[in-house]
Amino acid sequence: MSAKYTILEELIRPVVEGLGFEFWGMEYLSLGKDSVLRIYIETDAEKGIDVEDCARVSRQVSSILDVEDPITGEYNLEVSSPGLDRPLFSLAQYQAYIGSIVSLRLRVPFDGRRKFKGQLMGIESEDIVIRVDQEEYLLPIDLIDKANVVPQF
């Protein structure tokens, strides 16, 4: 995890949790002038996350970020639920989705490839076990750039 990510999480997590939501995770994409800070929030409530929830979190987070100013330049702030194809950020989230189909993109190639799609079989220490075409891979979580649950209908 980068230092910028850690600083942003330390500012944002308490705001999200203070509003009664779970901080699911975030993505910071620095794309030159068009940077994006995407925050995912979750709730235990049956109604789920709605637009008003996202707007409320967005206003509060925006206020904190305006004061603390951890991001240089302009950026777009997006707040949403993780959705059906939810991204996975923590070991606890991976643990909760063992048995599910996941799509992974690695920072650097592992065994000659950067993309994996298969069944999440488990966690061993700091590694993710994924089965792709009857072959199991043990991937260090630090190598994972992006991970999403693949919805099954």
From Swiss-Prot:
Disulfide bonds: none annotated. GO terms for cellular component: cytosol. Gene3D superfamilies: Ribosome maturation factor RimP, C-terminal domain, RimP-like superfamily, N-terminal. GO terms for biological process: ribosomal small subunit assembly; translation. It is found in: Cytoplasm. It comes from the Bacteria. InterPro entries: Ribosome_maturation_RimP (IPR003728), RimP_C (IPR028998), RimP_C_sf (IPR036847), RimP_N (IPR028989), RimP_N_sf (IPR035956). HAMAP family: RimP. Belongs to the RimP family. Required for maturation of 30S ribosomal subunits. This is Ribosome maturation factor RimP. The lineage of its organism: Bacteria, Pseudomonadati, Pseudomonadota, Gammaproteobacteria, Oceanospirillales. The gene is rimP.
